[in-house]
Amino acid sequence: MTLQQQIIKALGAKPQINAEEEIRRSVDFLKSYLQTYPFIKSLVLGISGGQDSTLAGKLCQMAINELRQETGNESLQFIAVRLPYGVQADEQDCQDAIAFIQPDRVLTVNIKGAVLASEQALREAGIELSDFVRGNEKARERMKAQYSIAGMTSGVVVGTDHAAEAITGFFTKYGDGGTDINPLYRLNKRQGKQLLAALACPEHLYKKAPTADLEDDRPSLPDEVALGVTYDNIDDYLEGKNVPQQVARTIENWYLKTEHKRRPPITVFDDFWKK
C-alpha cells in the first residue's frame, strides 16, 4: 500500500460522494450522538463566515431541528458563537452565514481582550510572543470560550475538521483542533462545497479564498499560500488521483510532520514518532 493509499484510508476519504447522502450521514451522526447521551442539551460551534463553519453549523441546526420535532424535547439547542478578534474583516460574511444557518441562539465573545491579557502576563514572565504563536493563542482562546459556553449549557463543542485540513495538520493543537465531535471528517474541500451547494448556501460563502486569519503581520493570509499547495491539489490527492511529484511530496511532508496533531498525547506505548 502506498503512502497515499494509507493516508486516504486513515482519513476515510472517498473519491466521489453523493451530497444528499453525506448531508444525511452527518445529520444522523449528530442526532445519534445526542440520543446516546441525553444529558447533552446543546451543540456549540464557532462561526467565522467561512466554508467549514458554515457547513458544520447548518448540519448542527438541521440535527437539532429534527430531534426536537421527533422527540418533543424543546431543551435541545444549537448555539452559534461569534468569536472576533477586535473587528472582523469579513463581518458581512459572518452575518450572511448566520442568516443561512438560522441558529437557535447566537452569542458573541470578542477574544481580543483575553488574548492581550494573556500576552501581557507572559511578557511580564519574560516571554515575548511571536506573531505566529500569538495566532495560536487566538485559536486557543476561541476554543476556551466555546468550552465555557458548552460547560454552562450542557453542551459539546463541534469541530470543522475535514480530510483536506487533517491531512496537512492545518489547525492549532488544542485550538480549533480540540473539539468533541467532527461531523465533516472524511470530506475534502470540494466535497464540502458540494454539500453547501445542495443546501442552497449563498455561493460567496464557499467560493471565497479560505484563510485562518490568525497572524497580525499577514492578515487574511490564504491557506493555500501558507501550505504551499492548493486545495485542488489536496483534494485530487485525497481522491486517489495522480498529482505532480512535488505536490505529493509537499502534502506527504505536511502529513508526516503533523501526525502528533491527529493523535492523543504521546505515551510510552506509542511508536509512530520514532524514526
Curated annotation (Swiss-Prot):
Give binding positions for Mg(2+).
52, 165
Tell me the SUPFAM superfamilies matching this sequence: Adenine nucleotide alpha hydrolases-like
Q: Where does deamido-NAD(+) bind?
A: 140, 173, 180, 260-261
Function as written in the Swiss-Prot or TrEMBL entry: Catalyzes the ATP-dependent amidation of deamido-NAD to form NAD. Uses ammonia as a nitrogen source.
Family classification: Belongs to the NAD synthetase family.
NCBIfam families, alphabetized: nadE, PRK00768.1
Q: What is this protein called?
A: NH(3)-dependent NAD(+) synthetase
Source species taxonomy = Bacteria, Pseudomonadati, Pseudomonadota, Gammaproteobacteria, Enterobacterales
Gene label: nadE
